[in-house]
Amino acid sequence: MGILKKENEKSAKPKYNMWQCSAYMISLAWREKEKKILLLCLLQVFLAVMSNLVNLYVAPSVLSVVERGASITELLTMVLIFVILIMFCSAATSYVNSNTLYGRVTVRLALISDINKKACTTSYPNLFEEKFTKLSAKCQQATSNNQEATEAIWDTLTSLAQNCIGFVIYLFLLVSVDIWLMLVILLTSLIGYFVNKKLTGYGYRHREEEGGISRKLWYQIRQAQNYTAAKDIRIFGMKPWMEEITDKAMTAYTAFHRRAHNVYIWGSILDLVLTILRNGLAYFVLIDLVLSGNLSVSAFLLYFSAVGGFTAWVTGILGSMTTLYRQSLDISIIREFLEYPEPFRFQDGEKLSDATGTQHEIKLENVFFKYPGADDYTLEDINLTIHPGEKVAVVGLNGAGKTTLVKLICGFFDPTHGKVLLDGKDIREFNRQDYYAMFSAVFQNFSLLAETVAVNVAQSEENYDMERIKDCAEKSGLTAKISSLKDGYQTYLNRTVYEDGAELSGGETQKLMLARALYKKAPFIILDEPTAALDPIAEADMYSKYNEMTKGCASVYISHRLASTRFCDRILLIGNHKIVEEGTHEELLKLSGEYARLFEIQSKYYREEDVCEKGQETAHLA
């Protein structure tokens, strides 16, 4: 089955053909109000054809004047006319070409924006789909520079149009010579085109393989340049190991493109053979006409040039079609990515504001969950209700499923079996963006914007409440640090982007994330190990303010430190993929179960550590 699936993927046709992809790019230019791209392309076509015709007729026309024995004045006039025409075409072409770049870049950037929007707003489970991640990597490659399909397609369409017009003009010019000659030229050209089309489809048929190789390579390159990995690379001597892995990825990448090149080269060889046959036959016919006295010298020169030009037009059409086909493969992939199915409901979901009041209750009913592609369940038979304003703590060993439970509550995943209900209604019925708006969170992995402190707290560049930002910073314990910064709340973060940007420590960043979570004022607040990077004093300060910080909202607090959960209304202990114990801190201790055992182990550790510190202090005083 695996082999059959792989073969089907290789032979799969692109979802959109090259004409649909071309129409898509034109509509995108129209949407972005870059209609001048089309006008400039038409001007390029007109000037290219005009320039070619001028160059075609210049030598035969001058020779014809000489053959007729015309005056020197007529000859010079003829030469001057052609010089002016050539200069005009050259100058106009340069002017038009210099004005085409901006609009094309704008359209490509708009496409990049669409791709980024899809990546940022897609249903969370899609991020774990291999097909989605491969399409995403291909989209990044297809929009990475000016030579990629999303921008180069305009040159291809322009080239195709001018080649088609030139072909028609030259066809009428040469049809009087020999109709069979024209048919032979067309036939050999079509054979070359269809064979080339089949060969150049190799890249698309093997796009899954190429996508996987590219993702590995670019991951290694990004990791080598990753600021956060710099310390690990140096301390653990990872440089040789990373170089070895990168070399393997580059070798695989090079090998793939070498195989593709070996396929493409056969198309080039066939083109060469067919071109020799076409030109040889055409020149034989023309020379025979001259020798039989049916063509003048100037006419021979015209047709001789026209045959070469006609062949160039035909080759140009086929080359442009082949290039357009190859570029359309990338654009088709981009469209597939943008249209990737969404398991969650967004715009078509029920508006949350219309369905619920201000007080909310979340309930998990018989929830089972396993990650995409996994065989075993991470969580089994979870039944949980979070009441309005309730403070719930979730504890358990590493890998117990605490963070997974939070992902289900937040709606990042839907249960494999069972339901997550908001105020008694399945969250799958709601607009998922509206549902996300119900939550504020501090996750284990967080990200800072290369923006000011104020913008990072408010998550908005405009219309933010400065007093509320300061209040949230005070509650999270970040006020002193912000006061020490050069521009206070207007200080930019991230030294990679801003030379004078501030760099926060892990604990300071965690406080900033807490301030951001408080600023949102959501009905539910999720705190996943919010004190992991804090020192004991800052941690104790956060505990003392917890009730104040979470006033008016329900909260879910995840922690490994069992002593830190005393201020919660209810504690859930996750173990063996289930909720094994539930109650207040005191109730769970009285049960003398797993929670009490873990608490005793942690308490013993802290007592021993305290005794050790006191012993060292006594020895120091002695």
Where is each model-derived feature located?
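Cytosolic ends of transmembrane helices, especially the final helix of ABC transmembrane type-1 domains
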Residues: M238, A282, Y303-E339
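ABC-fold ATPase nucleotide-binding domain signature/coupling loops
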Residues: S136, Y377, P415, L421, ...
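Membrane-integrated ABC transporters
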Residues: M1-S51, I72-T77, V96, T100, ...
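Transmembrane helix-loop-helix hairpins at lipid-water interfaces of multipass membrane proteins
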Residues: L38-A92, F172-G203, L277-F284, D288-S298, ...
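Extended non-transmembrane interhelical loops and adjacent amphipathic helices
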Residues: M1-A23, V105-E151, I213-F256, S328-P341, ...
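C-terminal portion of ABC ATPase nucleotide-binding domains
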Residues: I3, G488, S544, G552, ...
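Helix-to-loop junction immediately C-terminal to a conserved catalytic motif
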Residues: C410
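ABC ATPase nucleotide-binding domain helical subdomain, centered on the C-loop/LSGGQ "ABC signature"
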Residues: K419-L421, Y436, A454-E499, Y543-S544, ...
